[in-house]
Structures are given as structure tokens and as C-alpha cells.
Amino acid sequence: MVASSTPPNPGPVTAGDRTVTGGRTLMLVLATVGFALNFWAWALLSPLAPRFRDELGLNSFQESLVVAVPVIVGSLGRIPIGALADRYGGRLMFPVVSLITVLPVLFLGLVGHSALAALLIGGFFLGIGGTVFAVGVPFVSAWFPPEKQGLAIGVYGMGMGGTAISALTTVRLVDAGNTATPFLLCAVALLIYASVAWYLLRDAPGRTPPTESVTARLNQTVRLPATWAASALYAVSFGGFVAFSVYLPSYLRTAYDLSQTDAANRMAGFVLLAVVMRPVGGWLADRFDAPTVLAATLCAVVIAASVQATTPDLAPIGTLAFLVLAAALGAGSGATFALVALIAPAGKVGAVTGFVGAAGGLGGFVP
């Protein structure tokens, strides 16, 4: 008697299965929106830095400091916030971080833009918005099975496009209204999001909060080989993205004598491609394996950067090199956190994410 080769019927999809899937999708959407809105707030000062320089008579160092303070605070702040996310869950931390971020946004919009000291104080607390990244990675990864975590975290990572919202709208909103306009709109959006998140967000079923103190878990996390390996990878991939998004317009104007508008448009295209490629990198890590994807993306970065180091003609070689860099850095960022979700110990995904996210943010300052 020949055994049938037909695989067993897994049975019909139940209402419970659909409910779980729908719940995962809703949680992913809410987390991504929260990430984008907080990153919008985090990036509000950068587009206005030249205006502050002219209005307040700032020198180049002071102008750079206004931009750098929220970036540094947001990067380093991911370390404790990630540990707190492990302890209290995204259901609490997303609305809390969003509500806290509203305060410096309102301060800067209403009174904090009239003096350098006020800008630096407001920028310091505005950095809290940049810590939200460390909340979402453990939250999202807990909702999805291992074979889908890479894609899910990659989709969540598209929330970094919130910086593009700021870049594209802040100056226009100031010109259409006044300095307070973009800050007030962002504050309203964060308040609405915090309210919606409080009522709709739910931590994944079966989540078990760690019992150790935050300090103890941070000490344990810093000793994990996975923390340092993923931090180095993210410092290159996301740090490279940050560096290019900051310095690319100046480089294009200097090396190729482009107009400010043309350089800004090319930078926007670079950022957009990197953002789109982030979930692709996560999906590829699910499909194959994260180390293989990371090795391929890093090789692509080395080749494209080596080509661009010779300052070739912008059309077509230079443009192609920048496109490869954007795609590889975006995919590498997505694959890195697919790796984190797999190798970080249960209960420490947020803490590891905090360290890795800090390394990525600070990696952008290397140039």
C-alpha cells in the first residue's frame, strides 16, 4: 500500500486566526505611525537651523549644536528607553513618550525659538522623541512569529520617514504661517496619536515583563556579544544613512556644483529609496538569513562607496553609485534588526535595541 504524498489539510482558517492576524496588523500600523510622528518632532529643528542662524546671529558651531543636541539625546536615550520598554511594554511606552515629546515641541514653538539657550534646552528634551524607536522593535517583534519578524520590523522602520515629513513641510509651514505653525501642528498630531494609542494599543498575548531592575538588565545587556555585533552593523548601515542624509546636499554642491534645490531633491530621493528598502531588507532576512543579507549589503556599500570616492560623472555612474548606496544601507538597516529579534534573549530585545539604535544614531556623526 502506497502512502499518500498529499500533505495533511491544516484545516480552515478560523475566525480566531483572522482576529490574531488583524490584531498584528493594527498593532504594526499604530506603532509605525507613532514612530513617524515622534521622528517628525525629533527633526523639527534641523530645517530651521539656517533661519535661526540669521535671526539670532549664530555662528557655525552654534548652528550645528542646535541640530546636534536632539540627535545625540535621542540616540543615547534609546538605551534606557529600550530597557523600560522591556519592562512596561509598548502599550504604555508609546503614549507616554509621545505625550512627553509634546512638551518640548510646544515650548520651542511658542517661546523657545527666541534665544540660543532656549533652543538648546528645548532641543535637549526634544531628543526624547528620537528614543521611540527602541519602544517599537520589541513591541512589534513580540506580535509576529520569527519567520515574519524581519519584514514586520522593516515596515516599522519605515517610520524613520518622519524626518522626511519635517524636511518637506517645516519651512513651508513657517513661510505660510509663523515659526510656531509646524510645532503646533506636530503637537496636535502627537496628542491625537497618544489618545488613540492609549485606547487601541495592546501588548502581545503572553508577554512576561522581566523581573530584574532596569540597571541590572542594562548591565547584562552590555555584556552580550549580540549587543556589540549588532551595534557595529547598525553603526555602518543606519549611521551611513544618517551621514548621507545630512551631508549629501553639501557634497553634491561642492563636488558637482549643483544648485541647492537640485541637491536637496537628490537627497530626498536618496532618503526615500533607503526608507523603502528597509522592509525589503527585513523580508530578505526572513527569506534567506540575516547574516547573508548583511554581508551582501555591506559588500554593495563598499563597492559603491569606492566608485563614488573617485568622483565620477554624476550621470550615469555617480547617480547609480548613490542609488546602490541608498538601497544597500536601507536594506542593511532592516536586516540588522531582523537579526536582533532572533539573537537577543527574550525579555532583552528592547534593551539590545536601545544600544544598537544608539550606535546607529551616533554612527552618523563619524564623518
Give the ranges of each region predicted by the language model.
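Juxtamembrane intracellular "pre-TM" segments in multi-pass secondary transporters
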Residues: 11-21, 204-231
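Helix-loop-helix hairpin linking two adjacent transmembrane segments in secondary transporters
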Residues: 155-201
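A late C-terminal transmembrane helix in Major Facilitator Superfamily
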Residues: 346-367
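C-terminal transmembrane helical hairpin of 12-TM major facilitator-type secondary transporters
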Residues: 288-336
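Conserved MFS/SLC helix-loop-helix module at the cytosolic interface between two early adjacent transmembrane helices
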Residues: 76-114
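Cytoplasmic helix-loop-helix junction between adjacent transmembrane helices
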Residues: 122-159
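Extracytoplasmic gate region of multi-pass secondary transporters
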Residues: 45-49, 226-276
